[in-house]
Design a protein with these regions (language model features):
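Single conserved hydrophobic/aromatic residue that forms the stacking wall/gate
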Residues: 1-9, 13
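Short, basic/aromatic beta-hairpin or loop at an interaction surface
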Residues: 28-47
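Short, surface-exposed secondary-structure edge patches
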Residues: 53-58
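Loop/turn positions that initiate beta-strands
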Residues: 62-65
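Short, charged beta-turn/beta-strand-edge "cap" motif at the junction between a beta-strand
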Residues: 69-74
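Short beta-strand-centered aromatic/proline hotspots
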Residues: 75-83
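Short, solvent-exposed secondary-structure boundary/capping segments
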Residues: 86-97
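Long, low-complexity intrinsically disordered regions
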Residues: 115-149
């Protein structure tokens, strides 16, 4: 069933397109950070949206997403509030903090995301480096499908 209808969201979101997805290699942990309000941003590799066969449109302000856990269960609905594209080496400490991971520092963010993006790019013919364009996305939770304990 459609989460929007099954949770009484039909009237609010009926005409809104949305995507359903989980966060990287740790969907449960990162979804929990979203639910607790710690994680209010994410990042993705800009160039990978334009790969042949890629069907995901570039996120834009106002977009809705259903966040899934590792069992593909809906956790919450978020709305993108801001997107910016910057080179990997220029992702700000503010963005790293909003991502809510680890100690929330830029050094931690770079360490974890350098490995993550390098792995993603290894599956393509593209090269990942410090000048690779990163889509920084900020969002807010507009509906919680799962209560935080």
């Amino acid at each position: 069933r459609d989460l929007r209808m099954s949770r009484g969201l039909g009237d609010v979101y009926k005409r809104q397109p949305y995507k359903a997805w989980g966060f990287g290699d740790a969907p449960d942990q990162l979804a929990d950070l979203v639910l607790t309000g710690i994680k209010t941003a994410t990042a993705s590799a800009y160039d990978l949206y334009f790969m042949e066969g890629e069907e995901d449109p570039l996120p834009q302000s106002g977009d809705y997403s259903i966040i899934l856990n590792s069992k593909d269960e809906a956790v919450c609905v978020i709305q993108t509030t801001k997107t910016t594209v910057v080179p990997f080496d220029e992702v700000s400490k503010e963005h790293a903090y909003k991502e809510g991971e680890g100690d929330r520092s830029l050094a931690y963010w770079r360490d974890v995301h350098e490995d993550f993006f390098a792995e993603e790019f290894a599956e393509t013919e593209l090269e990942f480096n410090g000048q690779t364009s990163i889509l920084c996305e900020e969002f807010k939770v507009v509906y919680r499908a799962i209560d935080v304990n």
